[in-house]
A protein has these predicted regions:
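Structured, basic alpha/beta domains of bacterial-type, RNA-associated proteins
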Residues: 2-94
Length: 94
């Protein structure tokens, strides 16, 4: 299994409970075929440019181990989740 890091920017207007539910949803998806090693909620940050007419975003960093096939499914879930504004998944160097 490879090590990955995923940065997800979600709508900053969400309630804390909604953000926790999103983190749980993505963590559960990763844990089906991999293992989450850490989740860090970095909080609201100013964006470099407006996304969906918003100047701030709530940043979440998820580090995990998974098979490469899981990444496509994870990215598909990010795309169809309305609350997700931007995301990025990168493979960590060994």
């Amino acid at each position: 299994m490879n090590k990955y890091e995923s940065v997800v920017i979600v709508n900053p207007n969400l309630e804390e409970e909604s953000i926790k539910n999103l983190v749980k949803k993505f963590s559960d998806l990763i844990n089906t075929d991999g293992k989450v090693t850490s989740v860090e909620e970095m909080g609201k940050r100013k964006l470099a440019y407006e996304i969906k007419k918003l100047k701030e975003g709530f940043y979440i960093v998820i580090k995990f181990e998974a098979k490469p096939e899981l990444i496509a499914e994870l990215e598909r879930n990010y795309r169809i989740t309305d609350e997700v504004m931007k995301f990025m998944v990168v493979k960590e160097e060994e």
